[in-house]
Amino acid sequence: DTGPFFHNNAIETIEGAVAFFNGAAFNSSPSGQAVGGIILDGTQVVEIAAFLRVINTLENIRQSIDLLEPVARKTVSTVDQIKRWIGQAAQETQDSIQVLSGGGLHPQAVRYLEEALKQIQKAEHGILFRGKQALEAIKQLEKARAELLEIS
């Protein structure tokens, strides 16, 4: 989800990872030659990285909503399971914030994600209003998703 990337952690950002596949080191390798080389200009590298950041964030949002829905509907059977799912939703949401912020992308979506994270953290530490807080977090996650999918 977030850097560093590759088996040796050599690349810190997704932009750097995309640029690697555009560079001479990859293009002169057997794998690069097998695909005929990749030639992108700087704008295309940034656009591909932005696309990957948004796709990653959309998947994290999907996972967070899937984890929070049973909590909101109060269909989870054990407190341990509730805590585990809420904790995982918090991690996925935090990751979404880092991924978008790291690319300077979709600041309004980041604000929705930050509000969702606040609600998730309240649900994580509360008992009485956990379902309501999970539901509010889902609403904020859905707003973030809509912001990312808006076509301009």
Predicted regions and their residues:
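Periplasmic c-type cytochrome electron-transfer domains
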Residues: 1-152
